[in-house]
Amino acid sequence: MHVFDAAAVHAALPWPFLIEALRKTHFGPMPASDVVVQSDPAGGEAQFVTLPGWAPGGPVVVKMVGVFPHNAALQPPQPAVQGLVALFDGKTGGPLLAADGAAMTARKTAADSALGAAILAREDVEDLLIVGAGALAPHFAEAHMAARPSLRRVTIWNRTAARAEAVAATLREKGIDATVSGDLDRSVAGADVVSCVTMSDTALVKGALLRPGTHLDLVGAYLPHLREADDAALARGTIFVDSRNNMEGGGDLSQAVASGAITWESVKADLFELVQGKREGRTGRDQITVFKNNGGAHLDLFTASALSETLG
C-alpha cells in the first residue's frame, strides 16, 4: 500500500491533470456513496465524518475526516479539517493507498470548482475574486487560473485583512498578480469570476452587484444555516451544481428556495449532465452563471483514483 503525505499529494496532482481527470470520470455513472456523521458526544461543535464511495466495477474510497472548528485557536494552530483518504481494490477489498485528508480535500474541492469554471465561465475572463482567506483560498486561485488561463489578476477579500494579505503573498511568491481588497462590494462588481470559500452564516455577495457575464462559485455554505450569496445572486444567475444528489444540504440554495427566490427546478444541470452533453451550460456572453460546489464522496473517489494513476 502506498502512503502519500500532504506534500506528495500536492506534487502528484497538478491542477491541469486533476481537472482533466475529474472531467473524464464525470463521463461515467455516479458512484454509490454515503455519509456518516458522528457528532461530539460531549456536546461540542466537533464532528467526525466518514464518507464511503464505490464505483460500479471500480475501486472503493473511504474518507475519514474530523471537523474541529476551534483548532485555529490552539497553540500552535491546527487545521480545522484533518483526516485520511483510503482507496481499496473494488474486486478484492485490498488497500491500495492512503493519503493525507486535508491535502486531498483541498485538491478535489478546488478542482471541482475549477471544472465548473472551465465549463461555465467565459473564455476571456481576466479578474478573479476569492472571498475568504482560509486554507483553501490559494488552492482555489491556482485551480481557477489553470482552468481559465485567461485569468490575469487575483484579488483576495477577507474580514481579517492580514489573513487576506498572507494568501496574496503566498500567491505572489508563485508569480501570480495577487492583491488584497478592502471593499468587497466594489471587488464583486469588478470581477469576472467570484469564488467564495468561507464559513459565513450571512450572505456576503450581493447579486445586484454582479455584472453581466460573471461566473459565481459558491463553496463554503455546506450546512443549512450557512450562506455566501443573497437571494438576488441566485435569482439573477443560471444555477448549476456539481451533483444533484446532495444539492439540498447547503444554505445558499435551500435558503433561497425557502424564501421563494428560486425553486429546486431552477438548478439547470450538474457536472455529470454538463460533461456528458445532456444539458447546456453557458448560453450567452452576458449570462450570470452560478456553480454550487457541494462536494461528496464521489469526488473523493475520483481524486483518489487519479492519485492511483500516478503510481503507474
Describe the residue ranges of each PLM region:
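N-terminal ligand-binding/catalytic initiation module
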Residues: M1-A106, A114, D124, H298-L301, ...
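Short helix-loop-beta connector
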Residues: L120-D127, S150, R211-P212
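Conserved beta-strand elements of the Class I
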Residues: L128-L129, T289
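Glycine-rich Rossmann-fold phosphate-binding loop(s) that bind the pyrophosphate
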Residues: A133-G134
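N-terminal Rossmann-fold NAD(P) dinucleotide-binding loop
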Residues: A137-P138
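NAD(P)-binding Rossmann-fold cofactor-contacting core
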Residues: A147-K174
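Rossmann-like adenosine-cofactor binding region
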Residues: K174-A256, A261
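Adenosine-phosphate binding glycine-rich loop
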Residues: P224-G312
